[in-house]
Curated annotation (Swiss-Prot):
Protein source organism: Parvibaculum lavamentivorans (strain DS-1 / DSM 13023 / NCIMB 13966)
Residue numbers spanned by region Domain I: 1-64
Stated name of the protein: Holliday junction branch migration complex subunit RuvA
The record's note on its domains: Has three domains with a flexible linker between the domains II and III and assumes an 'L' shape. Domain III is highly mobile and contacts RuvB.
Coiled-coil intervals: none
């Protein structure tokens, strides 16, 4: 199995790139985001590779980051999501944006991807909620802070608030989404108690 390619961009197409590695050209299927991030022909590139083997062919799927590849694998585990749809989602949403959409139950953001209707978007959000690593989901959900301004890191009160809600019996994904929503309503100095209180209000809606 091929896990990584390091070489030169030979050529690109609508959904593929040919990477020259030591004189051998590898045809790699890519999302639109990956293609946008590739250097021009002749430029050096390293791609994380997911190898798909079928009776007809061996297919290489390329990603500019390991995170994108991991998300691709998660998406393929969702009922009704194949390679084309998964790449469509990753072409529309960066890993952090996808994690945020799932943590905040934002089906509309997911359905913006080509080939993803409301039902598939709902399945993606529902089936992946508990599969997103805790730190990834919380960090992504809180990345956009008050008034939409980015924050550099997740505060200790936010982490404590999520832990408290989980201890109260709420699922991890719901707790993260509630605290993220509460954090957007409060200022950066919000205490754990404030985040818990407002988080509970979000969960009661």
């Amino acid at each position: 199995m091929i896990g990584k390619l390091r070489g030169i961009v030979d050529s690109t197409g609508e959904d593929w790139a040919v990477i020259d590695v030591g004189g051998v050209g590898y045809h790699v299927t890519c999302s639109s985001r990956t293609l946008r991030n590739l250097p021009p022909a002749g430029g050096a590139v390293t791609l994380s590779i997911e190898t798909k083997v079928s009776d007809e062919a061996i297919r290489l799927i390329g990603f500019t980051t390991d995170s994108e590849r991991e998300w691709f694998r998660l998406l393929l585990a969702v009922q009704g999501v194949g390679t084309r749809v998964a790449l469509g989602v990753l072409g529309t949403l960066a890993p952090a944006d996808l994690a945020r959409a799932i943590a905040l139950d934002d089906k509309k953001a997911v359905s913006a991807a080509p080939g993803v209707g409301p039902k598939v978007a709902a399945r993606i959000v529902t089936e992946l909620k508990d599969k997103v690593p805790d730190s990834m989901g919380l960090s992504a959900a809180l990345e956009v802070g008050v008034n939409g301004e980015a924050v550099s890191s997740v505060s200790a009160p936010a982490r404590d608030a999520v832990s408290a809600l989980v201890n109260l019996g709420y699922p991890q994904a719901q707790a993260m989404g509630a605290v993220a929503a509460a954090a957007k309503r409060l200022d950066d100095a919000a205490s754990t108690e404030q985040l818990i209180r407002h988080g509970l209000k979000e969960l009661a809606r």
